[in-house]
Amino acid sequence: CDCTKLETRGTKLVAEGDILFLDSSTTVAHLAEELARSSFTSLTVITNSVAVMQLFRRLPAHYVRIALGGAYDPQLNSFLGETTVAQLAQLNVTKAFLSAFGLDDRNATTNHEHQAELIRKVMASSERNYLLVDRSKFGRTGLYRLSARGAFDEIITDRKA
């Protein structure tokens, strides 16, 4: 994975004052690291990821951090389930940065049922949705559909065109 390319392209899509949702994927965690080093002065970060919250705890107070709680999934190091979805339903998101287990010609997919449910809710509530996937995700298919490929405002990848 050329994650530097992914995180740089992702960071360029962020603007001052954005309300971001960052999912619990390792790909999006690279973007979170880049955002933590950036010069933004006003961002709100919403996440269900324990790793992302730990990263952003060191940021200045002008960053608003919102952690979605719920049932803890140790495999994904994140919170998922009905409580997480209910908390998300109360929030506005301007831009969501998401990843997937696989991306084929039709769909982005995952192997985690509750993660799929949360991502679908995030996409429905966000003004813009970005999928970050490294080249290893192409042609793979998971059990649960996140969304149609065309539902994303942009697919950010390190794959050569």
Region spans (language model):
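Conserved phosphate- and dinucleotide-binding cores of soluble alpha/beta proteins
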Residues: V50-A161
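N-terminal active-site beta-alpha-beta segment that forms phosphate/nucleotide-binding
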Residues: C1-L80, V85-Q87, L91
